[in-house]
Amino acid sequence: MSELSKALRERAEDSILQLRGAVAEFKNVCYANSLGSESSVLTDLIWGAVPQIEIFSIDTGRLYPETYELMERVQQRYGRTLSIYYPKTEDLEGWVGEHGINGFRNSLEQRRGCCGVRKVEPFRRAISGRSAWVTGIRRGQSASRATASPVEWDAEYGLHKVSPLLEWSENEIWEYIRKKRLPYNSLHDSGFPSIGCAPCTRAVQPGEGERSGRWWWERGDSRECGLHPRRQMGFSK
C-alpha cells in the first residue's frame, strides 16, 4: 500500500485489523458485496489481506448493466470468483404475479416486499450458518447509519455485523480506489454515489445526501432495503 498517503494507509491497516479480528473471533465470516464504491475498497482489503472471508453478491434480477459489468471486472482483477445468490423463482413469480413487475411503487409495504423477495431472502440463505457478516456501511451515508458501531449484534439475522469502513469518509474511499486503480461501478461517474436496483436508484443532485437517490419517491432518511433495519442491534462492542 505504498501508493497511499500515510493517513489513508493507516486507515486501511486499521480496517484490516478489524477484519482479522472478526476472523479470529467468529466462524465462517462472509462479506456482502453490494458492488458500490465501498465494495471496491473492501474487496481489495479482503482478497488482499484476509482471504478467509468469503465474498458474495446478490443478483436481484434488476441491476444496472454497469453493475453486471463490474462483477466481471472484479473477478478478472483478482482471479477469484464471487459467490452469487439469486431470488427464488417461485417467490419472485408469486410476488410479480400479485403486484406487477413495478408494484414496488404502489406503497412502502410493497416496496419492502419486493426487496424482501429479491434481496433479503437470498441474503438470509447466503449468511445461513455464519456467525458474522461484514458490511461496507459508513457513518456519513445516512442518519440511520451514523450511530452504528464497528461490531454489533444483528438481532434481525442472529449473527454479528462488522463494519470496518464505518469511519471512512467518501473522499477517503475514492482516494483509495484511484490510488490503487481499482475497478468500480462506472455509474459513480454519472452522479450515482449509491447504487442498487435500476428502477429504484437514480443520480443525485449537488447538495443531496449520498443515499437520496435510493427510493427517492419515499419520505424520510432511513430508506433501506431491509438488510440494515433500524433498531435491530442488541449490543455493540
Say what each PLM segment does.
Residues 1-237:
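Nucleotide-activated chemistry modules centered on ATP-dependent adenylation/adenylyltransferase
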